[in-house]
């Protein structure tokens, strides 16, 4: 095994004369990239022009913030809608047999959306408070509640298909009054 010689940079790592012989270009002398407008390209700008530019920029930023808030509100509103196909598929694949996993899944499909509906304001808290976007955020909140309702409906249908929802007359027999059709007459005696 032969010993390798160290790299060139390793030999001259601490040699200051070696570093000085390389011409290092200052980044201030490099040209700006295309489309970049720095302070040097503006030249002589009056105070009024700077104020007008800053007002235009602040108005554009406010408009951009408004647009971003509406987009964020719709992202929040569409989160439950994205889980609807998966929940339908899981509900279908788990079958209608009475087992703990499908029952818990169906109950979670009922309880999760109820909790989410009651915490709608906290879910939309980052985008609330701007009067310019209030109507659009309220529309997104309404759709959020609708999508949560769809998830609850999937859970209800799952529980109904398992027979856990009492919806037939036979499910309520213990609370029915007993009807006597013979008016106290006994037909058979011992």
From Swiss-Prot:
Query: Does Membrane count among this protein's keywords?
Result: yes
- Quick one: a GO cellular component term? endoplasmic reticulum
**GO BP terms:** phospholipid metabolic process; phospholipid transport; protein folding in endoplasmic reticulum; protein insertion into ER membrane by stop-transfer membrane-anchor sequence
InterPro entries, per this entry?
TMEM85/Emc4 (IPR009445)
Q: Where on the tree of life does the source sit, at the highest rank?
A: Eukaryota
Main location (coarse class): endoplasmic reticulum
Q: Where in the cell is the protein located?
A: Endoplasmic reticulum membrane
The way this protein sits in the membrane is described as: Multi-pass membrane protein
Q: For this UniProt entry, which segments traverse the membrane?
A: 98-118, 136-156
Ranges where the record places region Disordered: 25-57
Report biased composition (Polar residues) as residue ranges: 38-57
Record keywords: Endoplasmic reticulum, Membrane, Transmembrane, Transmembrane helix
Q: What does this protein do?
A: Part of the endoplasmic reticulum membrane protein complex (EMC) that enables the energy-independent insertion into endoplasmic reticulum membranes of newly synthesized membrane proteins. Preferentially accommodates proteins with transmembrane domains that are weakly hydrophobic or contain destabilizing features such as charged and aromatic residues. Involved in the cotranslational insertion of multi-pass membrane proteins in which stop-transfer membrane-anchor sequences become ER membrane spanning helices.
PANTHER family this protein is in? ER MEMBRANE PROTEIN COMPLEX SUBUNIT 4 (PTHR19315)
Recorded family membership: Belongs to the EMC4 family.
Oligomer and partners: Component of the ER membrane protein complex (EMC), which is composed of EMC1, EMC2, EMC3, EMC4, EMC5 and EMC6.
Q: Look up the further comments and give them.
A: Present with 1320 molecules/cell in log phase SD medium.
Q: What name does the UniProt record give this protein?
A: ER membrane protein complex subunit 4
The scientific name of the source species is Saccharomyces cerevisiae (strain ATCC 204508 / S288c)
Q: Which gene encodes it?
A: EMC4
